[in-house]
C-alpha cells in the first residue's frame, strides 16, 4: 500500500499548496465574491 500512501500525500500536498498560493496571492483589489482564476 506504499503507492497509495504516496498518492495520498501527493494529493494533500498539492491542495495545501493551492490553498496557500491562493491565500497569499489574494490582493485586496480583487472582489472576494468572485473566484476569477
Curated annotation (Swiss-Prot):
GO cellular component entries: chloroplast thylakoid membrane; photosystem II reaction center
Transmembrane parts of this sequence: 4-24
UniProt topology in membrane: Single-pass membrane protein
Localization per record: Plastid, Chloroplast thylakoid membrane
InterPro entries: PSII_PsbI, PSII_PsbI_sf
UniProt xrefs under NCBIfam families: PRK02655.1
Family listed: Belongs to the PsbI family.
Description of how the protein assembles with itself and partners: PSII is composed of 1 copy each of membrane proteins PsbA, PsbB, PsbC, PsbD, PsbE, PsbF, PsbH, PsbI, PsbJ, PsbK, PsbL, PsbM, PsbT, PsbX, PsbY, PsbZ, Psb30/Ycf12, at least 3 peripheral proteins of the oxygen-evolving complex and a large number of cofactors. It forms dimeric complexes.
Role played: One of the components of the core complex of photosystem II (PSII), required for its stability and/or assembly. PSII is a light-driven water:plastoquinone oxidoreductase that uses light energy to abstract electrons from H(2)O, generating O(2) and a proton gradient subsequently used for ATP formation. It consists of a core antenna complex that captures photons, and an electron transfer chain that converts photonic excitation into a charge separation.
Name of this chain's protein: Photosystem II reaction center protein I
Organism for this UniProt entry: Stigeoclonium helveticum (Green alga)
